[in-house]
From Swiss-Prot:
Residues 13-94 are annotated as: Ubiquitin-like (UBL) domain. The keyword Cell division does not apply. It comes from Culex quinquefasciatus (Southern house mosquito). Required for maturation of ribosomal RNAs and formation of the large ribosomal subunit. GO terms for cellular component: nucleoplasm; PeBoW complex; preribosome, large subunit precursor. Pfam families: NLE, WD40. This is Ribosome biogenesis protein WDR12 homolog. GO terms for molecular function: ribonucleoprotein complex binding. WD repeats lie at residues 106-143, 145-187, 194-233, 258-296, 298-337, 343-383, 387-425.
Amino acid sequence: MALKITGKAEGQLQLHLITKQKQFAVPDVPYSIRANVSTKELNVLVNTLLKDAGNAEAGKVEFDFLLNGEFPLGQHLKERDVSFEDTVELEYVERYPAPEPQDCLLHDDWVSAVEARDNWILTGCYDNTLNLWTTKGKHKLTIPGHIAPVKGVTWISLDEEKGVFASASQDQTVMLWEWNVAANSVECVQVCKGHERGVDCIAANGSKTKMATGSWDTMLKIWSTDVRSGGGDSEPSTSKRQKLDQGSARTPLMTLAGHRECISGVQWIDDNTLVTSSWDHTIKIWDLALNGIKSEISGNKSFFDLSYSKLNGLIITASPDKNLRLYDPKSNQGTLVKNTYLGHTQWVQSVRWSTTNEYLFVSGAYDNHVKLWDYRSPKAPIFELIGHEDKVLACDWSNPRFILSGGSDNSVRVFKSKIAIGGEK
């Protein structure tokens, strides 16, 4: 894609090349280039300058180029009008390499929840079960217990001996599970009851002491993650079946009202602050110290999911109008959409930020596609992750090495991310 130059003169353009990645910096002097220069030609220019400077990375790295903070030169993007009289400042960044398909984890029913932790993948399904897999694709456990589809899963803790995780279901309960890694056995140690309709989303806080759930009953509830008795459950931990039969239950630490329709997504900003999305067209930020709503962002469409990034402080949302939207909760103009991302052709069901790259997020939609985005490129995703044969219901990027997605084709697709923590290959 070429820069479009407006003005009487044609032919040459004065360009300053800048980068925030100091290891790839070139001399800060104006360069004279053709007005219709392409991304490929700019890559040759930058790599030639790096080679002339004796940079060992010269020729090994491909770059993308940004004008006014957005990618103007990539495929599918519209041309920008640039005045010939101006010296153009063009930022270049290392191009994110394409994720590679690694595995397809086949389940017995729709996969509606997925979350990775270290080398393990936890999934929740419409056949009411949870499943544990290794990131190499080996199935370890099928876990029955719920009596309706599982809509959310979250890891609480994991070490070499024991794992603790929770699941949220349309059966109105949240179950807290303890997994003996060596014996590969799992036990439901707490059943959390209090919601009056199906539970649609769940998330644990950063210190893993509490978890939050959102439901079709419009309520946000906060629970203890302590596997021991307490939080409303005074009975010693027994087997899952005994607990269900006897009706013993952990009660919530807190119930917060404010939404008018289903709470579709919940994330912790810090241990005292949460953000939720809802079908009622609002995003609400909650302060647990105040026991209520701190602020609110209103949209004109239902929100099916949201993701909050601790790296950049921004919120990305998924909606049924096929679009993703970016919000800054700290902005005085927080109700205004900072950007809208176009590319899906059906409802967008799920969205997740990268936990190690402040610019990247993934989305999954009813068009069977998972897309990888750079928030500086709103007109098109940087990659499409192909594989699902039916609707994508959930996606996850908790482990920076793997992008995961679950769908109504009964599968979890595993894509290996080339760049992990700190640019590690």
